[in-house]
A protein has these predicted regions:
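Extended, low-complexity, intrinsically disordered C-terminal regulatory tails
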Residues: 1-32, 83-95
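A general structural signal for well-ordered alpha-helical packing
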Residues: 1-5, 42, 69
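Catalytic cores and adjacent binding grooves of peptidoglycan-active enzymes
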Residues: 49-138
Length: 138
C-alpha cells in the first residue's frame, strides 16, 4: 500500500497528504472488528491546511482535490479503488455502484480510500496501474 499511497500523493499536485494509513486497530465503534487500515488496504488522504508545514499547507485544498478524486474514481478499476468516503460531504462511493451515496459519517477534512488487497500489497501492480492512468514518472 505504501507505493500506492506515494503515487496518490505525488499525482495530487500537492493538494493531498497522508493523514493515516497502516495502524493496528479495530473499526471505530466496532470492538473486535479489525479496521481495513490494519489490513493495509486503506489510507486517509487529507486536504487540511496545516500552517507552516511543508506538504500540508495548500490553499483551498478541498476545492483543488475534488477534480483529482473524480479522476481517481473514473479510473477505479485500474487503480483498484473499492471505496472512497468523502467525510466533508458525508457521502461514499463504492466500486459496485460507481456513484456517490449519502451516508452518516462524522465530519472530517479527508477522503478515506480503500484499495483491493491484491493491488494494495503489490508495488509492481500499483506501479503499472498508476503508470497507465498518469504516465510513467521519470
Amino acid at each position: 500500500m505504501d507505493y500506492w499511497i506515494t503515487r496518490a500523493i505525488h499525482h495530487s499536485s500537492g493538494c493531498l497528504w497522508n493523514n493515516g494509513s497502516y495502524i493496528i486497530r479495530d473499526v471505530k465503534g466496532k470492538p473486535g472488528t479489525i479496521s481495513n487500515h490494519a489490513k493495509g488496504v486503506a489510507v486517509d488522504l487529507s486536504y487540511r491546511m496545516v500552517a507552516n508545514t511543508p506538504g500540508k499547507s495548500i490553499y483551498m485544498g478541498r476545492q483543488r482535490s475534488l477534480p483529482y478524486i473524480v479522476k481517481l474514481l473514473e479510473n477505479a478499476d485500474t487503480l483498484g479503488i473499492e471505496l472512497c468516503i468523502d467525510y466533508a460531504m458525508s457521502r461514499s462511493w463504492k466500486c459496485d455502484r460507481g456513484t456517490w451515496k449519502a451516508g452518516n459519517f462524522a465530519a472530517g477534512d479527508w477522503y478515506h480510500i480503500e484499495v483491493n488487497p491484491v493491488m494494495a500489497h503489490s508495488p509492481e501492480l500499483a506501479k503499472q496501474a498508476w503508470d497507465k492512468v498518469f504516465g510513467v514518472i521519470p
